[in-house]
A protein has these predicted regions:
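Conserved glycine-rich Rossmann-like NAD(P)H-binding loop of the short-chain dehydrogenase/reductase
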Residues: 30-43
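Conserved small/polar residues in nucleotide/adenosyl-binding loops
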Residues: 184-185
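Rossmann-fold cofactor-recognition segment
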Residues: 47-61
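N-terminal Rossmann NAD(P)H-binding glycine-rich loop of SDR-like oxidoreductase domains
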Residues: 14, 21-23
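Conserved Rossmann-fold cofactor-binding substructure of NAD(P)-dependent oxidoreductases
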Residues: 58-71
Length: 185
């Protein structure tokens, strides 16, 4: 994809995969990048064409206002986790922790719901899932369930938003702060 001159919005864009995407898009010539996080100050060495914004993907009113103020854009990337993930054996897991893991799904649906209206007709949405969506390892049932739901959501909404596109990126284990927190599963 040629991103030269494009306006790109990246939720979860200040750490991990999102931070890497922000910096790569900057290097590849994006005209403007808005990197969004609940804690944008954690990003260091912010490229010149990157603006940092503080928004929680679960705050629908903030999202509505943000997208309205931004106007049209070309690419929407969402890799915001939405919160914490429950880990460990499901039969011993606190069910509230399991339910809370779905904040990622609700954040993704909020961003797609409120952002698609402003996405250019030839625009693209990219959602980050993960390999546990298709191959669940012991202790990863919450991550697997959420990833599966995110992937099903993208497949389901694709025809509704056409000709705009929606794609899933589904990495394996990446050296990120979130992955490091899951090592002890």
């Amino acid at each position: 994809m040629n991103i030269s001159g494009k306006k790109i919005i990246i939720f979860g864009g200040t750490s991990g995969i999102g931070e890497a995407a922000t910096k790569i898009m900057s290097e590849k010539g994006a005209a403007e990048i808005i990197a969004i996080s609940r804690n944008p100050d954690k990003m260091t060495n912010v490229p010149e064409n990157v603006t940092l914004e503080k928004i929680d993907v679960l705050d629908e009113e903030a999202l509505k206002s943000f997208f309205k103020n931004q106007g049209e854009f070309d690419v929407l990337i969402n890799c915001a986790t939405g919160g914490t993930r429950a880990v460990g054996p499901f039969l011993k897991m606190d069910l509230e922790g399991y339910r809370s893991s779905f904040a990622k799904l609700w954040g993704y649906t909020n961003v797609v719901r409120y952002g698609t209206e402003y996405l250019a007709n030839n625009g693209n949405i990219v959602l980050v899932s993960g390999s546990p969506a298709r191959k669940c390892r012991p202790g990863q049932i919450a991550i697997s369930s959420v990833g599966g739901a995110v992937e099903a959501f993208a497949r389901g909404i694709a025809s509704e938003i056409a000709p705009k596109r929606i794609n899933i990126v589904s990495p394996g284990v990446i050296d990120t702060p979130m992955s490091l927190s899951l090592i002890h599963i």
